[in-house]
Swiss-Prot record:
Name of the molecule in the record: Glutamyl-tRNA reductase
Active site residues according to the UniProt entry: 50 (nucleophile)
InterPro entries, sorted: 4pyrrol_synth_GluRdtase, 4pyrrol_synth_GluRdtase_dimer, 4pyrrol_synth_GluRdtase_N, GluRdtase_CS, GluRdtase_dimer_dom_sf, GluRdtase_N_sf, NAD(P)-bd_dom_sf, Shikm_DH/Glu-tRNA_Rdtase
Catalysed conversion reaction: (S)-4-amino-5-oxopentanoate + tRNA(Glu) + NADP(+) = L-glutamyl-tRNA(Glu) + NADPH + H(+)
Positions annotated to bind NADP(+): 185-190
Site (Important for activity): 95
Pfam short name (any one): GlutR_N
The EC number(s) this enzyme carries: 1.2.1.70
The organism of origin for this protein: Thiobacillus denitrificans (strain ATCC 25259 / T1)
Amino acid sequence: MQLLTLGVNHHTAPLAIREQVAFGPDKLVQALHELTLSKRASEAAILSTCNRTELYVNTVSPDALSQWFADFHHLDVRELAPYLYTLPREKAAQHAFRVAAGLDSMVLGETQILGQMKQAVAAAEEAGTLGLLLHKLFQRTFSVAKEVRSSTEIGANSVSMAAAAVRLAERIFPSVKEQACLFIGAGEMIELCMTHFAAQHPRRMTVANRTTERARPLAERFNAGVIPLTALPDEVAAYDIIITSTASPLPILGKGMLERAIRQRRHRPIFIVDLAVPRDVEAEVADMNDVFLYSVDDLGQVVREGMDNRVAQVAQAEAIIETSVASFIHWMEGRELVPVIRGLRDAAERHRRHELDKAHKALARGDDPHAVLDAMSHGLANKFLHAPTHGLSHATPEERAELVRLISQLYGLHPE
């Protein structure tokens, strides 16, 4: 079995690819069970966010994973291959540690990814697809993330995606305070965005969600209104700023709906930030003159502002991760030796019992105890020496040189 990470992220794949391989909540458990029941992996966890989709697995067939990944999303593996990365063993552990610590994020040092990773692990645990190896990996991962954040200032002055959305809105409108804001969805990202926009005291805030009951507690926190998604065609024209982040597999805001809204607004602009993957807004909306549409990838420049202040902390964080990876690999290699060590001990126990049984029988016959003990010790010595001497006798010249070195090292020999 082998620890392996396979996936795509904002470094390797554009949004148009990432949205095709995202695992929605309705598909996640199915995917985890498919992976493990098909024997492609004995353990599996899936991390799927707006910036990455990654499989963390314990597998005997790493080559089959990319094919499964493509097949699950009804894609051609040859078209997906240029965007995929496959990281084995220590590289997989290093990657997990870096992701959780925020070193691989679009926003260097951001903390939201750690919560998303914990949710992915909880989902895998609930699905029954975590075993000893992945449990240990993620236990170490969360410990390393905590150490990096407490020992460095990697997250200091970090600009979140939510804060970046506010900054972009301020570039479009003279004042957010005079605008009406619509938030589509009721998840963690929408909550963060509402927190940042509420600090600017917009004229009106409204939450639109598939189920208004789920949105109501969030809306009440910010003194916002609530509408169902079905009301969007009639309501969207009333809003200047729209932030959307749902788990919908299909777009919620179409070009036709927004064209009607712009006409109703007499071509007053609408600012939209689409933080969903797959996208909540049809891609064609970006071509409209009076709509300023920004995707997750478009926020990159804003969130990188101020990064210079945090880059100096990266080396210290990487040093912590390097040490932690070495420790984890040491544990993993030790675990891999357990069957061999157990086999050695079992063989030794069989030899011991065999010689002891012979000795008991000899003593029962009245044989001299000294002779019995001498015979038992010779028998044990011969049993334990048989394997190495037989190996040396039957090895090729190349194998023999390596065996001599190993046996000398194991038994502390110093051959002349």
